[in-house]
Amino acid sequence: MSNNFKLAPSILSADFSDLQSALHICKSGGADWIHVDVMDNQFVPNLTIGPLVVKSLRPKTRKFIDVHMMVINPETLVEPFAKAGADSITFHIEATDDPNSIIDLIKSCGCKVGISLKPKTPLSDILPFLEKVDLVLVMSVEPGFGGQGFIPKSNDRILELKKYLNENCLDRVLIQVDG
């Protein structure tokens, strides 16, 4: 796996009345991607951004828009976010009983596919799906709120995931760390 990395700041802490300034700060800071945290106040205890925000961002940036859905029933939001301009859509393994159908749906919408897991979810839960995804998002905090402390055991999970990807010729799969 390459040591290259992508810088993908979240707009979750941005001033939502001035997202243009947030995009400018991201660009001037060297961001490669714009990370959009989507929360539904059901899967996690917070409510954030919907497809209309992504739709308003799309004409203002050429950056890769990375949507991280922390929602129940993610299949209901895939198409709206794809149509709004998302380049990548990540869903949580814990939010669905049928990961394969969500992966296929995201791909059919022309987006890159990410799969994520909460800190206490075993890495083994996502292994059967890694051949079909473009990235794995490892949560290093409990999802739902910004400003939490990094969970140190996340380092071991990241190393374990990297080893698995390398040993299984899946080094094209990106590892994303959130938190």
Where on the chain are the PLM-derived regions?
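Conserved N-terminal beta1-alpha1 strand-loop-helix module at the mouth
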Residues: 1-90, 95-98, 105-108, 112-113, ...
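Short beta-strand/loop segment that forms part of the nucleotide-sugar
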Residues: 175-178
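Short gly/ser/thr-rich secondary-structure transition/capping motifs
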Residues: 116-120
